[in-house]
């Protein structure tokens, strides 16, 4: 490609509304332009990256035995009502009507559509297992789209769905998808972790997320420093302390704390170690419980894990925190004065809280706390459960090493769905015994547009993007200095351009009448990995300047060797 025949829409200034580096650089590099909130037009440079990501995904899915299909973005509401998600999905599901006032949705996922297809196409266990995938536009009406294509409303996704007659068969395909995803992200040159995850709104049993490690990531990625254990923050188990509870050394005393309504204020005003404090959070109980609220206790320096808490059988789903009015009606004290002593509702405490002694907590009286509380002496030990987020330094749940925490961007997710959708939609085949058998399903997603942004978050410097070779919009930039005045430079540029393209290398030749500084800045901004500079001075010595974008190193290479050098650098 020649810049004279290309739309190179680079920007010098960073747009004010771009918060994260990928959004800033995608705008500045001329990859995307905003159309409306959460909606983006992809420009030629962006599309080239997108297609390379798609191609890698498609190749590895095909290699893993998946079959490509293409399903409609617009889906009839009847399918969503049949699966039960019409009511469950919430406002992210964009509901529309056609001219006949028939309700439809813009698909955020395609479980219903593929299940409907399969129940009408398959009739025997002999046709299974099968794994279908598509690369298709999705739409989720995010309440606050942000971070460019990282959290947009419309996005491109690879979603796959597998169908089985046994859990063993599902596990085989699940493992194959795990391997395929690992190959996909490795080929793209990304630093990623596959982590155990909660199944969330999709449902099902086993689940893994594929997280690209990046400082700007929205997720906490947990992994051991001594093993391959990895999980997301919602799933990671906080192991119970091995040390037994220490003996009581203090009497419980009631202390006036009128200005301490938070743990931080209590610690500061009374010089308490935060590890000796407990915070009490009240949430709604399941309908029909003797008490409308449940108390959840975690150590003062720990955070409640809402996913774990919601899974407690006595806690209502979705997890809902009690309002101050509801708390006062039941406990007669405000949220900043709650604690386990004389609390008239059921209590669940975290494993760490269970081994605490001589601790401080609210007295369930406004402006007062109890200091020196001890379990079984001052209050009976309640139910104990893992309800907190892990922290760095916690022991790894597999018993090997301690936990580290890094930020991550979720780019892929695989689920063992089981029979959630097939049961609801009666997707069955004739089994080996001649009876109807409900199908077991898996689903496997990759956010194609999100991968592009995540790759940038991991590969940039102060001059722009640093693409890995496999997904760069162009692999080589040819910068001919003063080519419009130097026939020698022009002739060599054209020769190298043709030779590199003949080797299947994506080349961008900058044939604009621009200053060298502008040409260099643009090529670095859009992140082309390999740049060759042709100038009369170096050509006098039969040399070409080569620059590698990732480390900025320059070297002179003989004109007769440059093509071979680049082919080897790119293709190995």
Curated annotation (Swiss-Prot):
Name of the protein described by the UniProt record: Proline--tRNA ligase
Upper taxonomic lineage: Bacteria, Pseudomonadati, Pseudomonadota, Gammaproteobacteria, Enterobacterales
Gene3D superfamilies: Anticodon-binding domain, Bira Bifunctional Protein, Domain 2, YbaK/aminoacyl-tRNA synthetase-associated domain
CDD domains: ProRS-INS, ProRS_anticodon_short, ProRS_core_prok
Class of enzymatic activity (EC top level): ligase
Location(s) in or outside the cell: Cytoplasm
Originating gene: proS
Family to which the UniProt record says this protein belongs: Belongs to the class-II aminoacyl-tRNA synthetase family. ProS type 1 subfamily.
GO MF annotation terms: aminoacyl-tRNA deacylase activity; ATP binding; proline-tRNA ligase activity
């Amino acid at each position: 490609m020649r810049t004279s025949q290309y739309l190179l829409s680079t920007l010098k200034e960073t747009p004010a509304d771009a918060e994260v580096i990928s959004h800033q650089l995608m705008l500045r590099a001329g990859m995307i332009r905003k159309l409306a909130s959460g909606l983006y037009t992809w420009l030629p440079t962006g599309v080239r990256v997108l297609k390379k990501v798609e191609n890698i995904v498609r190749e590895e899915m095909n290699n893993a035995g998946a079959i490509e299909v293409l399903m409609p973005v617009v889906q009839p509401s009847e399918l969503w009502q049949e699966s039960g998600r019409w009511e469950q999905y919430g406002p992210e599901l964009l509901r529309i009507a056609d001219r006949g006032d028939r309700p439809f949705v813009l698909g955020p996922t395609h479980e219903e559509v593929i299940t409907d297809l399969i129940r009408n196409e398959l009739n025997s266990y002999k046709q299974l297992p099968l794994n279908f995938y598509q690369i298709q536009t999705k739409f989720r009406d995010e309440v606050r789209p942000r971070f460019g294509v990282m959290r947009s409303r419309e996005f491109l996704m690879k979603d796959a769905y597998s169908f089985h007659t046994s859990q063993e068969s599902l596990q085989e395909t699940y493992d194959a998808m795990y391997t395929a995803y690992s190959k996909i992200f490795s080929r793209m040159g990304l630093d990623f972790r596959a982590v155990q995850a909660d199944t969330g709104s999709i449902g099902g049993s086993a689940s893994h997320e594929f997280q690209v490690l990046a400082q700007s990531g929205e997720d906490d990625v947990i992994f051991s420093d001594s093993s391959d254990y990895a999980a997301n923050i919602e799933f990671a188990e906080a192991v119970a302390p091995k040390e037994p509870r220490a003996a009581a050394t203090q009497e419980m005393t009631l202390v006036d704390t009128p200005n301490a309504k938070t743990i931080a204020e209590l610690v500061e005003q009374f010089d308490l170690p935060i590890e000796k404090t407990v915070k009490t959070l009240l949430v709604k109980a399941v309908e029909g419980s003797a008490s409308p609220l449940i108390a959840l206790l975690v150590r003062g320096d720990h955070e409640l894990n809402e996913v774990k808490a919601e899974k407690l059988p006595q806690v209502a789903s979705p997890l809902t925190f009690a309002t101050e009015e509801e708390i006062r009606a039941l406990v007669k004290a405000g949220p900043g004065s709650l604690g386990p002593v004389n609390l008239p509702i059921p209590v669940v405490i975290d494993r760490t809280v269970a081994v605490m002694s001589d601790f401080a907590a609210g007295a369930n009286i406004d402006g007062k706390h109890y200091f020196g509380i001890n379990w079984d002496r001052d209050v009976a030990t309640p139910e104990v459960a893992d309800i907190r987020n892990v922290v760095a330094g916690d022991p790894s749940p597999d018993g090997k090493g301690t936990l580290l925490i890094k930020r991550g961007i979720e780019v892929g997710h695989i689920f063992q769905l089981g029979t959630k959708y097939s049961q609801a939609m009666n997707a069955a085949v004739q089994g080996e015994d001649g009876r109807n058998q409900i199908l077991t399903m898996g689903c496997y997603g990759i956010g194609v547009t999100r991968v592009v942004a995540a790759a940038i978050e991991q590969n940039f410097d102060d001059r722009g993007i640093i693409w890995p070779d496999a997904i760069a919009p162009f692999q080589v930039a040819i910068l001919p200095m003063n080519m419009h005045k130097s026939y020698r430079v022009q002739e060599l540029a054209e020769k190298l351009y043709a030779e590199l393209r003949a080797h299947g290398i994506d080349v961008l030749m900058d044939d604009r009448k621009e200053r060298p500084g502008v040409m260099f800045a643009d090529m670095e901004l859009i992140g082309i990995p390999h740049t060759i500079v042709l100038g009369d001075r170096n050509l006098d010595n039969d040399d070409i300047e080569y620059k590698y974008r990732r480390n900025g190193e320059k070297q002179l290479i003989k004109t007769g060797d440059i093509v071979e050098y680049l082919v080897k650098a790119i293709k190995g």
